[in-house]
């Protein structure tokens, strides 16, 4: 099933050169959302990985991470932690800074009460590039006195080395690789 899913995803995802900046090749995943059957298959594959990791909650960054994290958490009946850009959450927060492939000095936050101590958190995002966002989320989880138990991505960009920056003792899953 995964081989067929990969083939369908590669036909569906649109690559856009020089977006959002010159030199960046952007993978537009929005056509996946126009195909409910395909989107459901993606979430089902991510759910199988999540079940094996014994995660008890899912955390994803805005905005495209939400597209996969929320339905995955719902499918597994797990709580979902919103990871937002700075000053977007109304209550006390934990904060972590990070850099992206195409931007520096970013800050993300979670509510301080979003993750209970000793929780087992799976980080879900649409794309793994440099791992800047994922590293920042991992630090937020640690601030909440909890543990990242696994990672799941729709796409991994292999030339950017992000996977090497993740905790290799934890399950790391992705569906597509470019």
From Swiss-Prot:
Protein's GO biological process: adenine salvage; AMP salvage; purine ribonucleoside salvage
This enzyme's EC code(s): 2.4.2.7
Keyword Cytoplasm assigned: yes
Pathway(s) annotated for this protein in UniProt: Purine metabolism; AMP biosynthesis via salvage pathway; AMP from adenine: step 1/1
The keyword Transferase is annotated on this UniProt entry: yes
Catalytic activity field: AMP + diphosphate = 5-phospho-alpha-D-ribose 1-diphosphate + adenine
Subunit structure: Homodimer.
Protein name per the record: Adenine phosphoribosyltransferase
Organism from which the protein derives: Mycoplasmoides gallisepticum (strain R(low / passage 15 / clone 2))
Gene from which the chain derives: apt
């Amino acid at each position: 099933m995964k081989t067929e899913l990969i083939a369908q995803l590669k036909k569906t995802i649109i690559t856009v050169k020089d977006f959002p900046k010159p030199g960046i090749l952007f993978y537009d995943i929005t056509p996946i959302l126009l195909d409910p059957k395909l989107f459901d298959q993606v979430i089902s594959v991510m759910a199988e990985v999540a079940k094996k990791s014994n995660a008890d909650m899912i955390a994803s960054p805005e905005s495209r991470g939400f597209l996969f994290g929320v339905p995955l958490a719902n499918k597994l009946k797990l709580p979902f932690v919103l990871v937002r850009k700075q000053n977007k959450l109304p209550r006390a927060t934990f904060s972590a800074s990070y850099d992206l492939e195409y931007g520096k000095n970013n800050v993300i936050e979670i509510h301080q009460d979003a993750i209970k101590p000793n929780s087992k958190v799976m980080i879900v995002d649409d794309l793994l590039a440099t791992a800047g966002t994922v590293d920042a989320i991992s630090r937020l989880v640690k601030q909440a006195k909890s543990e990242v138990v696994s990672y799941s991505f729709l796409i991994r960009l292999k030339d950017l080395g992000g996977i090497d920056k993740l905790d290799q003792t934890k399950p790391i899953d992705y569906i597509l690789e470019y």
